[in-house]
Amino acid sequence: MELAKSFEPAEIEKRWYARWESAGYFKARDKPDAPAYCIMLPPPNVTGTLHMGHAFQHTLMDALTRYHRMSGDNTLWQPGTDHAGIATQIVVERQLDAQNISRHDLGREKFLEKVWEWKAHSGSTITRQMRRLGTSPDWSRERFTMDAGLSKAVTEVFVRLYREGLIYRGKRLVNWDPVLGTAVSDLEVVSTEEDGFIWEINYPLEDGSGHLTVATTRPETLLGDTAVAVHPEDERYAHLIGKHVRLPIAERSIPVIADEYVDREFGTGVVKITPAHDFNDWQVGQRHKLMAISVLTLDAKMNELCPTEYQGLDRYDARQTLLDALQAKGLLVSAKPHKLMIPRGDRTHAVLEPMLTDQWFMSMEGLAKQGLAAVDSGELKFVPENWTTTYRQWLENIQDWCVSRQLWWGHRIPAWYDADGEFYVAHTEEEARKQAGGRELTQDNDVLDTWFSSALWPFSTLGWPEQTPELERYLPTSVLVTGFDIIFFWVARMVMMSKHLTGKVPFREVYVTGLVRDSEGQKMSKSKGNVLDPIDLIDGIAVGDLVAKRTQGLMNPKQAASIEKRTRKEFPDGIAAYGTDALRFTFASLATHGRDIKFDLQRAEGYRNFCNKLWNATRFALMNLEGHDCGQEADQPMDFSDADRWIAARLQQAIGDVHEAFAAYRFDQAARAVYEFVWDEYCDWYLELAKVQLNHGTPEQQRATRRTLATVLETTLRLAHPIIPFITEELWQKVAPLAGVHGDSIMLSAYPQVDEAQRHPGSVARMQLLKELVNACRTLRGEMNLSPAQRVPLVIEGDAAVINTLAPYMVALGKLGEVSAVTALPEADAPVALVGDMRMMLVVEIDKDAERARLAKEIARIQGEIRKAETKLANPSFVDKAPAAVVQQEQARLADFAAMLQKLEAQHARLG
């Protein structure tokens, strides 16, 4: 079948992906003696859809997977999704809420049925989208963190760590989300600076000798105070340490204590201590053996330990009621505006409460030492290396991990309680009953933090706790590709769990990617209205549909108008369909070792043009190869030209550069090496040189050029395949047979290796000279204002043998009438170009008067531009106020105009 005239990605992508997957090409293969290469997909939330960050990282993982698969490794890319406890429960609860049903109306069992139902219908969206991106994980091994095998691993770990004394139950202060009704980890807390107040309140001394003025930003927790504190070296209050004050409203007696935690400069230097509602106060309370009185319910209302008139009030209503009461008693001294950090839940944006609750914790200190030892020994490396510091700092300051969550969706904690509240940790209820002597038991209602099961992902997916062949072969895995935002949440925890439970690190390297931002460097977010959907970049989207997408479901609907305005301005014609390959090439080109990635659609357009260029180059090659002798027979004589040897040598350089780039995770450099070889060397130079050979060469030369056209293109397609899989497969199917290569798919063919015998330094040097001569000739044509249609002669003073060899190429590429070697250039007014020790001149009869007039006019124009630029740069308000980049741009313009003027004046002078 003939290759289509233009590259239409949609049909090609659909056809090839289905063929690859159904043929089982993505499956891990067990080749004896081949090295193992394994990547674990960071399991996306089952609730999720593919966002730009996913698409970026999945492109890089797939490029590595395809590269190593083609390099002959036993390659496994392990896919799967995360049950995403909180996120999934929120989604399903919202759906029920729309029907005026709460999860409590349904009960736990029915609610979980609804969640599994939802997962069955919507849970595969993200994996469908991954397929659209051309990713090639082993789908036959796809896992879900709530699968039976993974759940078994979770239970085994919990029981094992409990028996080792690393998991314990205790009453501790946790971050409590009153909307979700669960504890959340420190890492799920978003603290933002907000406007508030600081109140000063008088606490009367119990002996009636006066009062202490306390400064607080949380007056509603006053009812739970169990002390007031001053700094031990604060002379203002030294005489009061050990005395007691009367707690307003609650009318309890509480002590005045001294603790270095108190900041003498904050407020009055006296602070209230509420151990049950503040993390710092909890620590103070532990040091001074203070009682912890919790005055809030789990939904942030005042509880039964408060005076009757406050019970049942929302925390903020209680605040106002309490302030009014203090005012009435003359105890409220002042209320001053104050900026403070407010902790909110990253899912609900609710203000979190430090809450004293019974929770399960994991002791982290010993595990953290193992995590630190892994980087110290070199077992684990971060790329870029500077992320090691971030990892290390967190592990050195680690706190015990609260692993329990008050949710219904997730891995239920394998602990059972008897009627007396005694608990038994076991693999099954039957095992727990044996421990309890057959007593009636009830399972703990809590589930484990989602990150608990995620921390086991690298080895649980390989069959642990069973000692499977896959576990032996693939652990430690090769590399984890992840964002810097989950180094704490996930990376460090995987390292600690894996080291402790298997004795091995989970991966040898962690490649930390940057964050994909918009073209202006802004973080992509729904509220900013700057989110791009990778599928829209593949398929294209009309501006109206894009606006609708960006303005739907906004938390603040008032933003819709400004988002629509910005979107219509940025994308007046919507977004064009770039296809998967162009999008992947764009992502690869942006994958530098920096922290942030600015995604610019112009790049996607540039790489779509690249795909079109590669397609058209292949069409040209096929037109000159199909039905012709392509030199596949070994006994056929071939006469390779310098051009043939040069392109073969340049290909070796590109192959070497790509290998180095993949080894260093420099996907940007791999993309650049492919781009520059295909566009700048194969298309712009070699195809033009090949035309000369094919049109004017001997049969042996033509055969050699066809052989080179085919083999270099076939190798280039294999070289580019990991980055742009679809177009390379489609083209390879047509080109490979002509290069004498046979196989079912490019993705199963061997990755190109450098062939030192193809370096050809002599040919490379001669072709470099040819390029310089052609470029000099093009410059001369430009200076003389010659149209491409004017085929004029060129004379070159230099080595006649070299010139005569290169002449046919120069005629074609320089659009010349002929090229002659001369011992000396003729006397003429035409400009002369120098290339090494060669001098060259176009032989053109020119109308001197007309040319002088043209040059004079151009000189006057350039002088005007120079004056404008100089005036601008002499203006202090421009230089001082304009952005540095704008000033530099103006300086560069001035330098360019000055160089141009020099050239034009020299040409004018030569004409006399």
From Swiss-Prot:
GO terms for molecular function: aminoacyl-tRNA deacylase activity; ATP binding; valine-tRNA ligase activity. It comes from the Bacteria. Its EC number is 6.1.1.9. A motif ('KMSKS' region) lies at residues 523-527. ATP binds at K526. Gene3D superfamilies: HUPs (3.40.50.620), Isoleucyl-tRNA Synthetase, Domain 1 (1.10.730.10), Valyl-tRNA synthetase, C-terminal domain (1.10.287.380), Valyl/Leucyl/Isoleucyl-tRNA synthetase, editing domain (3.90.740.10). A motif ('HIGH' region) lies at residues 44-54. Monomer. ValRS has two distinct active sites: one for aminoacylation and one for editing. The misactivated threonine is translocated from the active site to the editing site. The C-terminal coiled-coil domain is crucial for aminoacylation activity. Catalyzes the attachment of valine to tRNA(Val). As ValRS can inadvertently accommodate and process structurally similar amino acids such as threonine, to avoid such errors, it has a 'posttransfer' editing activity that hydrolyzes mischarged Thr-tRNA(Val) in a tRNA-dependent manner. This is Valine--tRNA ligase.
